[in-house]
Amino acid sequence: MRTAGERLPSMLDLRVICKRYVTQSFTQVALDSVSLSFRDNEFVAILGPSGSGKTTMLNVIGGLDHFDSGDLLIDGISTKDFSDRDWDAYRNNRIGFVFQSYNLIPHQSILENVELALTLTGVGHAERRQRARKALEAVGLGEHVDKRPNQLSGGQMQRVAIARALINDPEIVLADEPTGALDSTTSVQVMDLLKDVARDRLVIMVTHNPELAYQYATRIVSLADGKVTDDSDPFDATEAARREAKPTRKTSMSFVTALGLSARNLMTKKGRTAMTAFAGSIGIIGIAAILALSNGVNGYIKNGRGGHALKLPAYDFQTRLRPVVHDGRTGGYR
């Protein structure tokens, strides 16, 4: 049992995080001793000018970038010794990403785009399809499941990206400028959706739009020069209770799924596939010809022109005067 003064862990805890990008002649401090704790269901907006460290902090939280010093705690567990597999499991099981650029595959339907997020979880095809439909219905796109991204508006594509982020039921949704490429009306629609998402999970959003941030977010964190300059609602350690850790799921993709995705990609880009196959064939034929020629020459030399004496000029290096002829058949000199 915990004592009254014992600190209870938050869901996500950044402790004195530092991150620097070093070049040959310059060092950029992206995060300078950042300490923040997040609740498990709040809508946090990260504000600050360009270069203040907003996106870097989001990448560190999402495991896309690693901190140089400090620590990131998840349910009180340090990530200092996380392996690549641990980070993969963390991103796959607990994080949903929403980016400004949508990152949708153009030759697949939006249903297939959303479904793709489950291919590494070992979920069967029928269940993947069902959950993808449900996620698209939740964002108001249930009637557009067979359309491709180029048949949708910018706001609709961002909704697809949000559905893809939610299909794996993540505990944390990270949104990097989700309204940056949208008009004001569509931005409000996306913000309404994110606010609804934040009712039962943590949403951390980076934005340059303070009006939307103050209107929708439950907490505003301001950054400048890699430091936290303001926090409207800091986490209070005494308000939290220990959360039950969510079991991790093994990351895997079935052979049939991998084969199907590969075949779809090859058939979509037939011209490039044909050119690649043609170039590869030429390379293989060239290597085979070189090996055959090399073996033929070696055999020719070894057999001494079909059994005849192979005479190679040599010199007596002791006198350096008299030429000596080597008899390849007898092994002697004359």
Where are the model-predicted features located?
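Helix-to-loop junction immediately C-terminal to a conserved catalytic motif
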Residues: 62
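Conserved ABC ATPase "signature" region
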Residues: 77-78, 115, 119-122, 126-143
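Conserved signature/switch motifs of ABC ATPase nucleotide-binding domains
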Residues: 147-150, 167-168, 199
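Conserved ABC ATPase signature
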Residues: 148-158
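Alpha-helical transmembrane segments
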Residues: 285-319
